[in-house]
A protein has these predicted regions:
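Phosphate-binding/catalytic loop of phosphoryl-transfer enzymes
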Residues: 85-89, 94-166, 195-206
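Short glycine-rich, Thr/Ser-proximal phosphate-binding strand/loop in the N-terminal lobe
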Residues: 2-42, 146-171, 177
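Glycine-rich phosphate-binding loops at beta-strand->alpha-helix junctions
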Residues: 34, 65-72, 192, 214-233
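Polyanion-binding loop/helix "lid" in catalytic or ligand-binding cores
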Residues: 187, 193-209, 213, 228
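Short glycine-aspartate micro-motif
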Residues: 2-6, 63, 127-131, 220
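Conserved small/polar residues in nucleotide/adenosyl-binding loops
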Residues: 235-238
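N-terminal phosphate-binding loop and adjacent alpha-helix
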Residues: 22-74, 157, 162, 192, ...
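A mobile "lid/hinge" subdomain adjacent to the ATP/sugar-phosphate binding pocket shared
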Residues: 164-196, 218, 225-227
Length: 238
């Protein structure tokens, strides 16, 4: 089994992958001040729930992607503890199957690189990926598997939280999918603006990208907040 570690701004995702199949996924909070030992203790909690006396979890290797440089080293040390090997850390220098068509490939977020490489290998080209997380990111891969660039926007929950923090009369709102565009109270208005606004952003940006490409593209959506946006988007999504 391969241990996959995805270090995001809000959560660290852990996954076990065997023969191309995802066996489990778990999450920990991203805490920039945690040490390797503290993260290892958190990982032990995750793995202890999945261990079976007759089938212990054994990792043959690890792959790690990170958008939080402060803790990349700590999680890489954890990966080495569980595998006995140095993890593969995602960067433009590893083989992804993509040609990087941007001036500075090393400035592309590693999470975006993983999204783009997976989509290009598994979906019809050209393909656009949308990752709905702390930030909303679009990545564009053309019909020749060239990474053309993309779009970065504030994430759905980031914008919603900012309203509650920066506007004195607006509350913090629990995220859910709105049932209508017209909100009948403050909370429903905020949900409509945030969730439907993100869906309209997705629809509109995708249309403009397709116009620039000169042809339709496959749209692949991922990320922890996708479940709120997919049901209200007008675009055909994968």
């Amino acid at each position: 089994m391969i241990l996959a570690i995805d270090i995001g701004n809000t959560t660290v995702a852990l996954g076990g992958i065997r023969d191309g199949r995802v066996c489990f996924v778990a999450h920990m909070d991203t805490v920039r001040t945690r040490t390797a030992a503290e993260y290892r203790a958190e990982m032990e909690k995750v793995f202890s729930h999945r261990r079976h006396p007759e089938k212990p979890i054994r990792f043959e290797g690890a792959v790690l992607t990170s958008v939080v440089p402060q803790i990349t080293g700590a999680l890489a040390e954890c990966a080495r503890h569980y595998t006995g090997k140095k993890p593969v850390i995602v960067s433009p220098d590893i083989r992804t199957g993509l040609t990087m068509g941007v001036p500075d490939p090393h400035a592309v977020g590693k999470d975006r690189l993983v999204d783009a490489a997976y989509a290009a290998a598994n979906f019809p080209l050209p393909v656009v990926t949308v990752d709905l997380g702390t930030a909303t990111t679009f990545n564009v891969i053309d019909e020749n598997k060239v990474f053309r660039g993309g779009v970065i926007c504030p994430g759905l929950s980031t914008g919603l939280r900012a309203l509650g923090e920066r506007c004195a009369q607006l509350p913090q709102v629990h995220l859910s999918s709105p049932k209508s565009a017209i909100g009948v109270d403050t909370e429903k208005c905020m949900l409509s603006g945030s969730v439907l606004g993100t869906a309209v952003l997705l629809d509109g940006i995708t249309q403009r990208i397709e116009e620039e490409l000169g042809r339709p593209a496959t749209l692949v959506v991922t990320g922890g907040l996708a479940k709120y946006v997919i049901p209200v988007s007008y675009t055909h999504l994968r």
